[in-house]
From Swiss-Prot:
Part of a membrane-bound complex that couples electron transfer with translocation of ions across the membrane. The keyword Ion transport does not apply. This is Ion-translocating oxidoreductase complex subunit B. Its EC number is 7.-.-.-. Binds 3 [4Fe-4S] clusters. [4Fe-4S] cluster 3 binds at C124, C144, C147, C150. [4Fe-4S] cluster 1 binds at C49, C52, C57, C73. One of its GO terms (molecular function) is 4 iron, 4 sulfur cluster binding. It comes from the Bacteria. Residues 32-90 form the 4Fe-4S domain.
Length: 191
């Protein structure tokens, strides 16, 4: 055998061995799903409300990972947009004008009018409505995300969306800035 043939066979054997190792590694260390979509989904509010135009938060997260805009989530508001912008290293955009940031709302069931059909319970994506068939239903306010998916299926129209009032738990306190954190124009206004 000539030296060239031995070299070609040796290279062929090395290539086959390397291919087998890479094939094994591809199967053994395969990543399930899209990791960036999972990180995006973790930042979304999980209301599954559909106000973004997608049927839930996970499809919207996959769309963002595929290049869709990050400003279509009204329940998440500006805080979610900023967190998504930081994660994806893009410029934050104002909330989409079509959705718009609205005051926080919760569902309120007028219990005297409720017929107990359970359609609102089935429509609620976060199980914030409790009740039994042919019994009145009520909303667990701390669980309600204000997505208003329960309003439309109600056959007697006894569900209203009301604005959450400010209390000590929901009121946003403005933190005063320390003098070292103020920029020159802020110092002039503070004086």
């Amino acid at each position: 055998m000539s030296a060239v043939l031995i070299a070609v066979l040796a290279l062929l054997a090395l290539c086959l061995l390397g291919g087998a190792i890479l094939g094994f590694a591809a199967v053994r260390f395969r990543v399930e799903g899209d990791p960036i979509a999972e990180q995006i989904n973790a930042l979304l509010p999980q209301t599954q409300c559909g106000q973004c135009g997608y049927p839930g938060c996970k499809p919207y997260a996959e769309a963002i990972a595929g290049g869709d805009k990050i400003n279509k989530c009204p329940p998440g508001g500006e805080a979610t947009i900023q967190a998504l912008a930081d994660l994806l290293d893009v410029e934050p955009e104002p909330l989409d004008a079509e959705g718009g940031e609205k005051p926080q709302m919760v569902a309120y069931i007028r219990e005297a009018e409720c017929i107990g059909c359970t359609k609102c319970i089935q429509a609620c994506p976060v199980d914030a409505i409790v009740g039994a068939a042919r019994q009145m239903h009520t909303v667990i306010i701390s669980e309600c995300t204000g997505c208003d998916l329960c309003v439309e299926p109600c056959p007697v129209d006894c569900i209203d969306m009301i604005e959450v009032g400010s209390n000590l738990q929901s009121w946003k306190w403005n933190r005063p800035l320390a003098p070292g954190q103020l920029i020159a124009t802020d110092r002039e206004q503070a004086a």
